[in-house]
Amino acid sequence: MAKTPEDFSATPDTPGDKGHPGTVDSAPLATRRRAQALAVCIAAAFLTLLDVSIVTVALPSMEHHLALSPAQATWSIAGYTLTFGLALIPSGRLGDEFGRKKVFLVGMVLFTVTGVLCAVATTATWLVVARLARGVAAGLVAPQVVGLLHQMYPPRERGRAFGYYGATVSLSTAIGPLLGGAILQCFGTADGWRWIFLLFIPLDLAVLPPALRLLPESRRAERRSSLDLVGALVLGLAVTAVMLPLLETGGWSGRRWWLAWTGLALLAVFVLWERSVARKARRPLVDLNLFRERAYWVGTLVAAALYGGFTGIFIVLFQFLQQGLHYSPFKASLCTVLFTLGSAACGIISGRLVHRVGRPLVIVGTACTALGLTATALVVGGSEAGDNMFLRMALPLLLAGCGAGLVIAANQTLALHRVPRREGSTAAGVYQTGMKIGTSLGTALASSLYFGQLLASHGDFSAAARTGLLGAAALAAVAFLVALPGLTLRGRRDGEAAVGAVQEVEPVG
């Protein structure tokens, strides 16, 4: 029979239940080995996330030397994001069913191979196809990273692990443009983009031996369930239809609206199908009882809105600084480094505090992010060509970055704290899919506002940047409003339950 809500609220870390045998995690790891395994997971997450930001800087070089059309140029970046998002939930289920370590290793091998294919691409089509495959590989790895952290750490220690994970997200976003700009400057624009992919390869390979040796095994307690292939297909079509309109350039034509509405309709079909599968006592692709946990679905919405907000600022600022103020990619990246440093530092701090402070960290963090982005928009809107933008934006971006860092680790810890370990990778896949959709929405919103205002103002880059950044700030404000009920009586009880879980529940693996 399908699980009841109590299966999620009462025993968040039980290995399974009678209806659906769960994942039996390996014995608890020694502290030193667990720290080493954490480093492996963080390294893999860093590489898959770095691929997005570092390649963006190389896009003009790839456009020129492979004769990419505008559509191909968009797909070389957006296609990676799309297939990354598509793979997250099915690969999360694969990890829960067949073992997170196995799926992690397969994903890293594929990520390495596709990096080689990108580096040696000789045509635009070759590059785009390799980028699509690379996104699938990254999507195989990402849910296993979170699932493994969920598996390796008892609840009272997960906040710290997720703090390091959140810092990794922030660092990869900022280091990518800096590193990409440095590589292009060192190797030249003709072949520099190839070196970006080539330098990934030894790093990817370096992750494999320690992963094979250190990562814990997970296995099914009884006979494996058959995979929900119909659910995977319907969900894949739904996510594609929702994300494609957000990733395409240009205005919102009738076709893009139809795609978006079709995607939402397919999501409804997916929910009905998953309920049908659960009623037949089979294992669905996504156990919908996850969404009976208020902390989980609220946390997923907060993550989607927040990632949409702070992703949008990079799109706008890089365009403004390079096109409007004629900064080099490297110099433009330096202007945003304080956001990253603040986010990384506060991510680690948040991970250490979440089990003592709870939900208020998310409230304060989203508020700081929204205020910081709004202040950045006002500063940029009043700027002139001779201004030192690093100094003008320093405090607002630092505030926004610190706010984002407070949210990332705390929100993920609170969202997943009552998820059973047997569902760890699947729950992470759903959570990260929400992040990807939010990221795509933020990119589309900020870009549309920026270029729309640029056209309307006849080339006023400052006004365009202000408008785009206000759009990003609006998404951060949405994250704040979604998280705000955490200060109500029920929200305080949810936070207390989270702390209670970390104090009482012992690890099984």
Task: Describe each PLM feature range.
Residues 78-92, 138-146, 150, 337-349:
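Central cavity-lining transmembrane alpha-helices of secondary-active solute carriers
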Residues 1-50:
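Cytosolic juxtamembrane N-terminal segment immediately preceding the first transmembrane helix
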